[in-house]
């Protein structure tokens, strides 16, 4: 059978109701803890924030509600394990009442422990951990394969996977574009190859024709030689003609060689012309890449690549500059301000916009000039902070460490110390030092103002505790069998009963029940009933009660 929680009860706050019922028994009012739940857990103070209207009812001094940031109120019994209501000493008389109170206090502690166990994570019928339909908060990131994984770590993994998918789709689209461009270049290259082959064939024809001219000239030379032999008899007369023919043959041979060289040049030029896309005035547009085995010299100060531009040059106080830009303006530049070997501020990298990194590390110092700031920016529902690490170990962080609040936190992993700046106050989880003064987490204060003591010790040493007051809750006469009504709950209280013999008799009560006292030669047997508001004289001997007083709580 499932355990039913009996020592904790919550009520909804509506901004109008101030009275709430206490459904459980308790030994002392200080064991009842009243807490508002909403923006935080606010523990209320008795007689300041609430009071006991009756034994089973508390009344708030203010009607709390959602407008104040609180939606529910919790009534919880927390019986002290150190503040015992009954303390036994050697030689004392064991009374049933004392034994009952001691036993009830022990039972209450056990019952509260059982309820606390029932209200926390447990084990179901199959032996598995059961969070009972509630969240597990403040869970560290998983490390090993069988660790529990927090939702934030899953979201980060999903975001990284989605980003990788988008980048892969982008690369695929770019590859598709490059493939289409390559297909176009291939078609253009095929056309150029056909044209080049045609020009090569034409050039070869020109070269063959030049060779024919060369052969014809040789034939003319042979014919002239035969004529010279035949005209040997008239050699003197024909010498001038032979010399002229030889000169003509030599000139023809030179012209043929020149024609062959020009044909070779024309073939190379045809290949060069095939690589040119177009010529616009003095601007030449190439179809493919330009390869230079040596350095590439440019007489102007830069070059364009698609929509992007790169500039080189230098002016006064900017000895050398390498700048990247586009049609809308400059994007970034690297410059050496003066010709010197000094680095420092002499070498500058300037970006006209945001710098976005995808990981990695930066070495060296980051220096911000006067008037500049270091700004961390993230989505409104994301955490952002500065984290210091030593190797793989976290040292400290400053910032908003979670994504569900706007608090600024200074946290030291090494010392476990945290300072949190909230909307209108600051919270520290350890002692807070102001000069030589110390403020403890429980509200205690230590300092020279109190003689170097803690404030509670100083007050105990310097002042006498105020005595409790008494209140008369009934007066009259209650003979045997008579039952009367009192104005306050008599259960678990220090009471005084005045009997007919004018003697006051002290008694410590428990729950509703029957009690017995001896009174100055007589005795009284009485009953407390009706949730502590009824008093009945069962029987007496010369001890008729005529007044009852209770010690104020």
Curated annotation (Swiss-Prot):
Compositionally biased intervals (Low complexity): 234-254
Matches recorded under Gene3D superfamilies: 2.60.320.30, 6.20.70.20, 6.20.80.10
Origin superkingdom: Viruses
Single Gene Ontology MF annotation: identical protein binding
Keywords on record: Host-virus interaction, Late protein, Viral attachment to host adhesion receptor, Viral attachment to host cell, Viral tail fiber protein, Viral tail protein, Virion, Virus entry into host cell
Subcellular location: Virion
Family annotation (Pfam families): gp37_C, gp37_trimer, Phage_T7_tail
InterPro entries: Gp37_trimer (IPR048388), Phage_T7_Gp17_C (IPR022246), Phage_T7_tail_fibre-like_N (IPR005604)
Transport among keywords: no
Composition skew (Polar residues), residue ranges: 187-197
One GO cellular component, as annotated: virus tail, fiber
Keyword Nucleus in annotation: no
Biological processes annotated in GO: adhesion receptor-mediated virion attachment to host cell; symbiont entry into host cell; virion attachment to host cell
Spans annotated as Disordered: 180-204, 224-261
Main function: Structural component of the short non-contractile tail. The tail comprises six fibers made of gp17 trimers, 2 nm in diameter and 32 nm in length. May attach to host lipopolysaccharides (LPS) to mediate primary attachment to the host cell.
Family: Belongs to the Teseptimavirus fiber family.
Subunit structure: Homotrimer. Interacts with tail components gp11 and gp12.
Protein name: Tail fiber protein
Species of provenance: Escherichia phage T7
């Amino acid at each position: 059978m499932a355990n039913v929680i009996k020592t904790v009860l919550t009520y909804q706050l509506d901004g109008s109701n101030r009275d709430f019922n206490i459904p459980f028994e308790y030994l002392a009012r200080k064991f009842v803890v009243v807490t508002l739940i909403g923006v935080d857990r606010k523990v209320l103070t008795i007689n300041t924030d609430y009071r006991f209207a009756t034994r089973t009812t508390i009344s708030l001094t203010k009607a709390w509600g959602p407008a104040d940031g609180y939606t529910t109120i919790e009534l919880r019994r927390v019986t002290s394990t150190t503040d015992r209501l009954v303390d036994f000493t050697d030689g004392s008389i064991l009374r049933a009442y004392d034994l009952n109170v001691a036993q009830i206090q022990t039972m209450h502690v056990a019952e509260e422990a059982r309820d606390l166990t029932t209200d926390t994570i447990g084990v179901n019928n199959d032996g598995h951990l059961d969070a009972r339909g509630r969240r597990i908060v403040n869970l560290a990131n998983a490390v090993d394969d069988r660790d529990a994984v927090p939702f934030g770590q899953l979201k980060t993994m999903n975001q990284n996977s989605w980003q990788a998918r988008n980048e892969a789709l982008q690369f695929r689209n770019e590859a598709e574009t490059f493939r289409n461009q390559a297909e176009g270049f291939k078609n253009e290259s095929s056309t150029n190859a056909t044209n080049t082959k045609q020009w090569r064939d034409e050039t070869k024809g020109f070269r063959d024709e030049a060779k024919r001219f060369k052969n014809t000239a040789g034939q003319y030379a042979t014919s002239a030689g035969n004529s010279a032999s035949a005209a040997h008899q008239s050699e003197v007369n024909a010498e001038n003609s032979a010399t002229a023919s030889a000169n003509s043959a030599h000139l023809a041979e030179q012209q043929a060689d020149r024609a062959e060289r020009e044909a070779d040049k024309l073939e190379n030029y045809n290949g060069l012309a095939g690589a040119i896309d177009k010529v616009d005035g003095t601007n030449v547009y190439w179809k493919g890449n330009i390869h230079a085995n040596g350095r590439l010299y440019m007489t102007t100060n830069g070059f364009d690549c698609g929509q992007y531009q790169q500039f080189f040059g230098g002016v006064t106080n900017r000895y050398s500059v390498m700048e990247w830009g586009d049609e809308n303006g400059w994007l970034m530049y690297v410059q050496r301000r003066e010709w010197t070997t000094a680095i420092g501020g002499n070498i500058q990298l300037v970006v006209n916009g945001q710098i976005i990194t995808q990981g990695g590390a930066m070495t060296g110092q980051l220096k911000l000039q006067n008037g500049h700031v270091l700004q961390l920016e993230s989505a409104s529902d994301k955490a952002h902070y500065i984290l210091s690490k030593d190797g793989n170990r976290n040292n400290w962080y400053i910032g908003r460490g979670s994504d569900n609040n706007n608090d600024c936190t200074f946290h030291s992993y090494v010392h476990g110390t945290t300072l949190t700046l909230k909307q209108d106050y600051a919270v520290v989880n350890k002692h807070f030092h102001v000069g030589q003064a110390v403020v403890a987490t429980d509200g205690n204060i230590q300092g020279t103002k109190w003689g170097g003591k803690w404030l509670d010790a100083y007050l105990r040493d310097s002042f006498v505790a105020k005595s409790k007051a008494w209140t008369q809750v009934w007066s009259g006469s209650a003979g045997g069998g008579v039952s009367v009504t009192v104005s306050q709950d008599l259960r678990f209280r220090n009471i005084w009963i005045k009997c007919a013999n004018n003697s006051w008799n002290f008694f410590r009560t428990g729950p509703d029940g029957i009690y017995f006292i001896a009174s100055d030669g007589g005795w009284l047997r009485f009953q407390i009933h009706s949730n502590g508001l009824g008093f009945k004289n069962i029987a007496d001997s010369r001890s008729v009660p005529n007044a009852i007083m209770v010690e104020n709580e």
